[in-house]
Regions:
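N-terminal signal-anchor transmembrane alpha helix of single-pass membrane proteins
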Residues: 1-31
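Membrane-proximal soluble helical/coiled-coil segments
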Residues: 49-151, 157-159
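Conserved hydrophobic register position within alpha-solenoid helical repeats
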Residues: 64-65, 93, 124, 155, ...
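Solenoidal tandem-repeat scaffolds enriched in leucines and small polar residues
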Residues: 148-217, 222
C-alpha cells in the first residue's frame, strides 16, 4: 500500500512539474512575441488576442498592427469565411473583419447586405460601420429598410459610428423624404441628431412640420443638436404649440440647447403644460438660459399652479446641485 501511495504521489508531482514547465514556456514565448512576429501568427487564439488589444494602443501603433495582421495566414483564413457556404461562418467572418479594419473587404460586405440570412446582413451592417465605410451608407440604409429594423439601435450605431463624415450621405437620403418610409426618416433623423451635423438644416426645419408625429419629434430634436440658428429657434417655438406633447417636450429641450432667450416668455407660459415631461423639459431649458432663466424660475415658485411651483423648485435645486459639484 505504501508503495502505491508513493507511486501516486510521484505521478502527481510529475504532472505538476510538466504543467508548470508548459505554462512557463508559454509565458516566455508570449514575452518574446514582438510586432514582427505578428505577420506569422498561425493561431486563431493569438489573432483574437491581438484584436482585443488594439483599442488600448495608440492610433499609429494600432494601424501598424492591423496592417501586419491582415497579412497573417490566420487572418486570411478568417477573411475567406466571407464566402463560406455556412451562414453562421459568414456572419462570424463579418464580425472579424469589422474588428480587423481591412477596408479591402468593403465591396464583399456590401454584397453581403443582400445575403439571404438576416443575421449575416446585420453583421455586415455592423462591420461596415466599424470600417467607417461612408460610401456604403445608401446600401446600409436600404439593408436596414429591408430588415424593417430602424428601431434596432445596434444597426443605427453602425451609421452613428461613422460620425460627421456620413452627414452628406444621410442628407442625400433625407432629401428624398417623399420616397422614404416614415421609419427610415425617423432613423436617419436620429442618426443626424447623434452626429450633430446636418448638411441641409432647411430640410430638417421642413420635416419639423411632417404629418407623422414621431418624425416631427426627431426633426425638432435635430434642430437642438446641430449648429444653432435663429431660424431653428423659430421652428422650435412654433413646435411648442404642437397638439402632441412629445413634440412640445422635445421642442422645449431643443430651445434650451439653442440658448435662445427669445423663447423665455413662451417657456414661462408652458410651465403649466398638462404633460409632465413638457413641464420637465421646459424647466430644464429655462435653467440653462443663465440668470434670466433662473429669475423666471424663481418667479414661478410663487405661481398659483402647484405643478408649476414644484417643477420650478426641482429645476432650481438641480442647477444649484450642478453648480456646487462644478465648484
Amino acid at each position: 500500500m505504501l508503495l502505491v501511495l508513493t507511486a501516486l504521489a510521484a505521478l502527481l508531482l510529475a504532472t505538476l512539474l510538466v504543467f508548470n514547465w508548459w505554462h512557463r514556456r508559454r509565458d516566455e514565448r508570449l514575452a518574446r512575441l514582438s510586432l514582427d512576429d505578428l505577420t506569422h501568427a498561425e493561431s486563431r487564439l493569438e489573432l483574437v488576442a491581438c484584436l482585443e488589444a488594439l483599442p488600448g494602443l495608440h492610433a499609429t501603433e494600432a494601424a501598424r498592427v492591423r496592417d501586419m495582421l491582415c497579412l497573417s495566414p490566420a487572418a486570411r483564413r478568417e477573411l475567406a469565411g466571407l464566402r463560406h457556404g455556412s451562414a453562421s461562418r459568414r456572419a462570424e467572418a463579418c464580425r472579424f473583419v469589422g474588428r480587423l479594419g481591412d477596408t479591402a473587404v468593403v465591396p464583399r460586405l456590401v454584397e453581403l447586405l443582400c445575403d439571404q440570412d438576416p443575421a449575416v446582413r446585420r453583421e455586415a451592417i455592423r462591420a461596415l460601420g466599424e470600417l467607417r465605410a461612408v460610401e456604403a451608407v445608401p446600401d446600409i440604409a436600404d439593408a436596414i429598410e429591408g430588415l424593417k429594423e430602424w428601431s434596432n439601435l445596434v444597426l443605427l450605431m453602425a451609421l452613428i459610428r461613422m460620425g460627421p463624415a456620413c452627414a452628406p450621405a444621410i442628407g442625400a437620403l433625407l432629401a428624398e423624404h417623399g420616397a422614404r418610409s416614415p421609419a427610415m426618416l425617423k432613423g436617419l433623423l436620429q442618426v443626424t441628431s447623434r452626429i450633430g451635423v446636418a448638411t441641409d438644416p432647411a430640410m430638417i426645419r421642413a420635416l419639423a412640420s411632417h404629418e407623422d408625429m414621431e418624425i416631427r419629434v426627431e426633426a425638432v430634436r435635430v434642430l437642438g443638436a446641430i449648429e444653432p440658428d435663429p431660424r431653428s429657434g423659430d421652428v422650435c417655438l412654433a413646435a411648442m404649440d404642437d397638439a402632441e406633447w412629445p413634440v412640445r417636450a422635445i421642442a422645449a429641450s431643443s430651445l434650451g440647447r439653442l440658448r435662445d432667450e427669445r423663447a423665455l416668455a413662451r417657456l414661462r407660459g408652458a410651465m403649466g403644460d398638462p404633460a409632465y415631461w413638457v413641464r420637465h423639459h421646459v424647466a430644464e431649458a429655462m435653467a440653462s438660459m443663465g440668470e434670466a432663466g433662473s429669475e423666471s424660475l424663481r418667479d414661478a415658485l410663487h405661481a398659483a399652479n402647484p405643478f408649476v411651483r414644484d417643477m420650478a423648485a426641482q429645476a432650481l435645486f438641480m442647477r444649484a446641485l450642478a453648480e456646487g459639484e462644478a465648484a
